[in-house]
Amino acid sequence: MIKVALPKGRIANESLALFERLYGSKFVFDDRKLILEHQGFIFMLVRSQDVPTYVIHQAVDIGIVGLDVIEEQQANVVKLLNLGIGKCKVVVGSELGKSIDYQKPQLKIATKMPHITRKYFSNKAISIEALKLYGSIELAPLVGLSDAIVDIVETGVTMKQNNLKIDEVIMESSAYLIANKNSFYEKKELILALYERLKSTLDSK
């Protein structure tokens, strides 16, 4: 039996669709249920940001989560396979019609991802203050809270609708299959068998 943490929403749905292709069987959570046991797997629905925590502490054996979450949390996990689903970009954005003033002694950057943000600007030798927000990031530069934002975009439409533009792409992200280090050794055959099946299915696309 392999325990799997899935992030609620689109990535969970796309992941379950992958498992359906692999095993020729429906993988469907009952209404409002957070646990699904099927075909030798126990799936658990959790918040995206919590997937690495479940994996690191071996509450589950493996998880599926975006590379952006792994990088932000510097998660100590085994990265097994890029599943190519849940594709998005982490970008620097600012108000339309304005340029980011890099001459300022320190820029204020609003973000849900302070680690990725600090690392990116540090590598460019730009001094910043990362303002951690939990939602409505797009609002920050429009009301003078920040000079720019670092946020996740899929198409960029939401930014345009909020009078913002993409200035720079920090990284491209998609969902990865990750494993707990102990589980990887304790259940190596099972996990590697799943890895091979997933890889074969993805390669045949």
Swiss-Prot record:
InterPro entries in the cross-refs:
ATP_PRibTrfase_cat, ATP_PRibTrfase_CS, ATP_PRibTrfase_HisG, ATP_PRibTrfase_HisG_short
Molecular function via GO: ATP binding; ATP phosphoribosyltransferase activity
The record's listing under Pfam families reads: HisG
Top-rank taxon: Bacteria
Q: Name one GO biological process term.
A: L-histidine biosynthetic process
User: Where is the protein localized?
Assistant: Cytoplasm
Q: What is its main location?
A: cytoplasm
Quote the function comment for this protein: Catalyzes the condensation of ATP and 5-phosphoribose 1-diphosphate to form N'-(5'-phosphoribosyl)-ATP (PR-ATP). Has a crucial role in the pathway because the rate of histidine biosynthesis seems to be controlled primarily by regulation of HisG enzymatic activity.
Protein family per UniProt: Belongs to the ATP phosphoribosyltransferase family. Short subfamily.
Q: What is known of its domains?
A: Lacks the C-terminal regulatory region which is replaced by HisZ.
Name this polypeptide is given: ATP phosphoribosyltransferase
